[in-house]
């Protein structure tokens, strides 16, 4: 079980070929982060394998995997897209699209046979690439006058958030990103600085 502020995904494309009773299943695991990317990749594979009987798929998006969909593309309901999505879930992955292309071999596989074949093809494609862990991060924006710069940067150095954006002038601004589980401590330290600076520091939570 993953920690609440960690998710697993892939960064490379994986491929696999699964054969069952002369039907060939070509499976592709693709890293994606947006619905537009998903649509583009589906279109690419539909055009590339225009002569295939079925181009089925499933995807899961978002750091918490809260956006997902599966498609049977003409196969009996629940025999293709759902087993593919099930493999994405079983490996606790998100931000991934799996496409399985089927070339019919002349022998019907039946409902259970299709489920097994699509599940196996998807699993092999997902297992063909490394699974990596990423953290779910939160951001804060700090606004302050220049005399506070050293104090602000000292906390940055000690807590090690990632500095996303910075402006150092008479009026300064920094935008910091940090793993969610560590963000409260960072905010707490800056809230103490708000008090000691007599409200010269403003904190905006994003």
Region spans (language model):
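Glycine- and acidic-rich phosphate- and metal-coordinating loops
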Residues: 94-104
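C-terminal regulatory domains involved in ligand/effector binding and gene-expression control
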Residues: 1-78, 201-206
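Short amphipathic alpha-helix segments
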Residues: 143-161
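Short amphipathic alpha-helices in soluble, non-transmembrane regions
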Residues: 152-158, 184-194
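Conserved short beta-strand edge segments in small beta-sheet-based binding/regulatory domains
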Residues: 163-168, 192-206
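Short glycine-/aliphatic-rich beta-strand segments at the starts of folded cytosolic domains
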Residues: 130-146, 174-176
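Conserved mixed alpha/beta catalytic, RNA-binding, or beta-rich assembly cores of soluble enzyme
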Residues: 77-90, 101, 114-118
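Terminal, non-globular segments
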Residues: 176-185
